[in-house]
Swiss-Prot record:
Cystine residue pairs: none
GO molecular function: oxidoreductase activity
Family: Belongs to the class-III pyridine nucleotide-disulfide oxidoreductase family.
Matching InterPro entries: FAD-bd_OxRdtase (IPR050260), FAD/NAD-bd_sf (IPR036188), FAD/NAD-binding_dom (IPR023753), FAD/NAD-linked_Rdtase_dimer_sf (IPR016156), Pyr_nucl-diS_OxRdtase_dimer (IPR004099)
Cofactor: FAD
Cell compartment(s), UniProt: Secreted, Cell wall
NAD as UniProt keyword: yes
Top-level taxon: Bacteria
Cysteine sulfinic acid (-SO2H) carried by residues: 44
Protein name stated in the entry: NADH oxidase
Amino acid sequence: MSKIVVVGANHAGTACINTMLDNFGNENEIVVFDQNSNISFLGCGMALWIGEQIDGAEGLFYSDKEKLEAKGAKVYMNSPVLSIDYDAKVVTAEVEGKEHKESYEKLIFATGSTPILPPIEGVEIVKGNREFKATLENVQFVKLYQNAEEVINKLSDKSQHLDRIAVVGGGYIGVELAEAFERLGKEVVLVDIVDTVLNGYYDKDFTQMMAKNLEDHNIRLALGQTVKAIEGDGKVERLITDKESFDVDMVILAVGFRPNTALADGKIELFRNGAFLVDKKQETSIPGVYAVGDCATVYDNARKDTSYIALASNAVRTGIVGAYNACGHELEGIGVQGSNGISIYGLHMVSTGLTLEKAKAAGYNATETGFNDLQKPEFMKHDNHEVAIKIVFDKDSREILGAQMVSHDIAISMGIHMFSLAIQEHVTIDKLALTDLFFLPHFNKPYNYITMAALTAEK
């Protein structure tokens, strides 16, 4: 029987552990260490919880220590790993305040990522704290269950008068939180160093639609501004950028995450951003040591190269692949396209692959084709919304590199999966134009926006 130690029980770790226990539990001894007090919190639901769009946090957990141990794992919670001797194959962790050593034959990192702390005057992390607490009161990070719970508890305390909130970071998390706070009746300003929201996921003509959507719902946008300082006497009073000052009661820092790979200790090869560099089996530069989820690289099929794309969906898939290989059952990942989506005030946006800007930066002779139309025929009077689509492709190979869609019709969310597969399988824009897509008025048009975008593509 092989002994496998897993460091981290986040999404990737939980997927990995469950895969091993469900498929190869009789063949392996599974030992898990996690520095947190809970397992499997769905951070993607954090904004829904804060914005009171769901009843509570209970549904945001799908596993726990008891469930994993019932399947046969040994799980140590609140137990940070302090060091790893890769030659002796021994993990040293802090368990109940004491040093604990655990040998292994295979090791899997699922250490995830940590919030980026931008160089802002007046903001520091409390030293020795594992829950990302800031030294200035009401400066909040958003990563863990505890972070969301703290924000909710503070907002529920009416004596604090937390009515004005600044969200720093215009990515998915920042935009979702801005909506959540506005839904609570707060005065919200969204600040980002770039001049648009959702930068990197969509081209600017699409991001402008979301920007207008936010402004239409009373969220102030302070884009193209660099945060210089957060000031206050013990607690937040104002946020200072290079262009203006905002009187605020709370600041949410949501500027992104970096891979948590401190345990590499100079012994494991890292990617340019510090992530564990892994192959398609999720194996690192040390044989028998694997890394899954946000702490590891992925193979980007659109770029045809190694990349870093931190998404829960990627975490689950890489966790499954890592589990199979750590258990001695060879399985290669097929790469990713970075498929993603967001829904804000009923405006749904989905994308996969590369934006036009990113495709050109990656060296492609890229161009785009697009189309705007109703989802269904004009005679369908109810629930018939406009859809905008953009397809990015390479003019030389004609291969599809990316796609973006936006609509108030949530049906577009399923269409992006087809484009994800198209990128994975190197489908050309010309083949897409003749792909068999069904027609029924309840769903779409005979010449639907996908077909029309492909048919009108530059030859």
